């Protein structure tokens, strides 16, 4: 399912912070099955697995992403022992115009993994995540990542790991997985995302009505 050799061969970039980007990390032959089993998400925002139907090829993908082979490669790349840290993940199916504002991930996160699962060619100007040199402007960036099918972005979470993207409104499928400092963080974040997801569903029902 994953091209582990390509990941091993991908160099870690160290400016403006530690990160790596790899296109086609998910092998193209899995596109149809994973796309078919991608959970149904009607609104924008991050949804924890407890609020979604995780099944089939998508479930297999998540099990591999949280598996020992991927963890070992990322541990070596970032010179970390990730075996002692728990993971958590959320799924996004849509992007709202206000999403993508410049930010760093929280201090409770050690490494962030973003795996994009959109069509092979992203034709939009918005929604392309930028690795930023500073928090001052989206135009001050080191690299722009197209959220094409199977594109992987992994970065070390620091006080300077600024990122964001231009506004986009529409379908934008991405999985975010994090290694975090403790199980308490997992419980807190999953609970927070769960409450947020329920509120989004209620809001969506009222809007459709």
Show which residues each predicted segment covers:
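Fe(II)/2-oxoglutarate oxygenase catalytic core
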Residues: 1-154, 158-209
């Amino acid at each position: 399912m994953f091209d582990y050799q390509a990941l091993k061969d991908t160099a870690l970039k160290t400016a403006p912070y530690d990160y790596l980007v790899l296109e086609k990390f998910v092998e193209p032959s899995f596109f149809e099955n994973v796309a078919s089993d991608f959970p149904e998400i009607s609104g924008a925002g991050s949804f924890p697995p407890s609020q979604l139907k995780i099944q089939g090829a998508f479930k297999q993908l998540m099990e591999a992403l949280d598996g020992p082979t991927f963890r070992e490669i990322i541990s070596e790349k970032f010179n970390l022992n990730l075996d002692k840290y728990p993971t958590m993940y959320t799924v996004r199916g849509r992007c709202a115009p206000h999403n993508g504002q410049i930010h760093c991930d929280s201090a409770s996160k050690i490494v962030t993994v973003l795996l994009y699962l959109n069509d092979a060619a992203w034709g939009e100007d918005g929604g392309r995540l930028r690795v930023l040199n500073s928090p001052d402007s989206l135009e001050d960036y080191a690299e722009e990542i197209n959220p094409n099918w199977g594109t992987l972005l992994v970065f070390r979470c620091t006080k300077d790991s600024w990122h964001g993207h231009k506004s986009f409104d529409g379908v934008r499928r991405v999985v975010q997985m994090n290694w975090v400092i403790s199980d308490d963080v997992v419980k807190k974040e999953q609970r927070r995302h769960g409450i947020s997801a329920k509120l989004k569903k209620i809001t969506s029902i009222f809007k459709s009505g």
